[in-house]
Every structure is written in structure tokens, then in C-alpha cells.
Amino acid sequence: MEKKCPCYVEGKNTEKRMDMSKALFITGTGTDIGKTYVTGLIVKKLAEEGKSAAYYKAAMSGNDRRADGSLIPGDALFVQKISGITQPLEEMCPYVYEHAYSPHLASRIEGHPVEMAVVRDGYRAVCDKYDYVTVE
């Protein structure tokens, strides 16, 4: 039985369907407990087995700036390095914040609120491009 993509919105996208087993959601009960590390290892293992694997995180906070002032998505960069994947950082996370608060608070402070449509569209694009997507 086919299942609709978890980001499917009736009337908002085509009838494209996705096997739900292609996405793996990594969660934890706190910060600094190893979610990103474990996610990186999962992506690495998938890639080593010849799978087209990707990483997606809707928002991340506590990021450093490059010399040009742009923000570096730290968790995405870490996963990219530990796993060896070449997925562009820009498609890994649509919302990157500097302040080291929860993303919802950092988004308010920085005046760049998270829009669910942007998160869904980014996730959908990654799902369309890769065989396996890990979501943190």
C-alpha cells in the first residue's frame, strides 16, 4: 500500500507519493545528547552501502558566521564531514540562526520566523532528490 509523503498537503502538491520507509526521524529529549552525531553515522552507513542519503533539519541555532557574514549551519556541516556526503549545506537546513537559543526563540530574536511551507518545500525537495532522508 502506498502512503502519502508525511509533508503532503491536500491540494497543495501533486499526487507524487513516497515510501514512508525512506525517511528516518531522529529525536531526543534534550540538547547535546548525540542526535547529530548518531544521524551523521546513520547517513555515513547508508552512503557506504551505496544508498543516496541526505540530511534535513528544519532549523538550527547557535551557528557561527563566515568572514562574509553569512551563517554556517554547524550541524549540517558536521553531518556532511562525518558522513562524507556531498549534499549542499543550503538544502540541509532552510533556517539557520546565530543565537544559541531554541530555534523558535532565536527566530523571534533575529526576526526571521519559521514558515511551515518553507520547511515542507525544503523537505519535499530533499525527498525527491535522495533515496533516504534522515530528519533531525
Regions found by a protein language model. Give the residues of each.
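Cysteine-centered motifs
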Residues: C5-C7
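Extreme N-terminal starter segment of soluble prokaryotic enzymes
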Residues: D19-F25
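Glycine-rich phosphate-binding P-loop
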Residues: I26-T39
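N-terminal phosphate/diphosphate-binding loop that engages ATP/GTP or pyrophosphate donors
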Residues: Y37-G111
